[in-house]
Design a protein with these regions (language model features):
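Conserved phosphate/anionic-ligand binding catalytic regions in large, soluble enzymes, centered on
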Residues: 1-28, 131-150
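A structural-propensity feature for long, helix-poor, extended segments
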Residues: 35-80, 177, 184-186
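Disorder-to-helix initiation segments
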Residues: 1-15, 39-50, 54-57, 89-96, ...
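Amphipathic, well-ordered alpha-helical segments in soluble domains
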Residues: 1, 22-29, 64-67, 71, ...
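Amphipathic alpha-helix face/heptad-repeat signature
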Residues: 18-22, 50, 57-64, 99, ...
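Amphipathic alpha-helical interface segments
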Residues: 68-141, 157
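Acidic, Mg2+-coordinating active-site segments of isoprenoid diphosphate-utilizing enzymes
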Residues: 33, 38-39, 75-82, 149-164
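Preference for long, well-ordered alpha-helical segments
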Residues: 110, 117-120, 132-191
Length: 197
């Protein structure tokens, strides 16, 4: 089991922290440990579907983590643009506004996908093998870390946006997902804890 988890982590990782993919990788591991067991024959089709969805989601989260770093680069460069004249200030402000939006939209996708991973982990916690149930709980913690970590990237960018309507819309969507994600993470973790303790 440990070797399987490590190979999934290696598949999920890059050169950046990958909390979201790691959480999904743990779900995949639980799913794989459930397959071909007589005790779980009734739910095997569901487990196979959950593994497939989780694999796709893990790939999306890995891509988004890399994309998050990529969209930050223009924002980082924009901070260094000249602002000595009014024209330079206006040009810098326009570049900054666009870069802040781009640097908020990708983390929002991470928040959405992290929440989606919690829904998959919830179902794996209900249907998956009991011998690896603790991994569902850890996966939920990783998913929550991804969700809340990405939300901080959104908030730090929206705070600087001049378009307050857009900033408030992004914040509202993020806060809604944080609330739902915290509740679901607590539910999944709590169910695991109740079963194993």
């Amino acid at each position: 089991m440990y070797c399987q988890a490590m190979s999934l982590f290696r598949a999920a990782e890059g050169h950046r922290p990958q909390w979201g993919p790691w959480g999904v990788a743990l779900g995949i591991m639980v799913g794989n440990l459930t397959l071909d067991k007589r005790k779980y024959a009734d739910v095997e089709p569901d487990i196979k579907e959950l593994i497939e969805k989780s694999q796709s989601l893990m790939d999306e989260l890995k891509h988004l983590t890399d994309e998050d770093a990529r969209v930050f680069e223009p924002l980082s460069r924009a901070y260094g643009l000249p602002r000595g004249t009014e024209e330079e200030k206006a040009a810098r402000e326009a570049v900054m506004e666009h870069a802040l939006l781009e640097a908020s939209l990708v983390p929002l996708q991470i928040v959405e996908k992290a929440y989606e991973s919690l829904t998959l982990l919830e179902e794996l916690g209900e249907k998956g093998t009991r011998i690896a149930l603790s991994d569902v709980g850890v996966g939920a913690l990783f998913a929550r870390a991804a969700l809340e970590g990405a939300s901080l990237n959104i908030f730090i960018n929206t705070k600087l946006m001049k378009d307050r309507t857009q900033a408030e819309d992004l914040n509202a969507r993020t806060e809604e997902l944080i609330d739902k994600g915290r509740a679901l993470s607590d539910k999944v973790y709590g169910a695991v804890l109740k079963h194993i303790k």
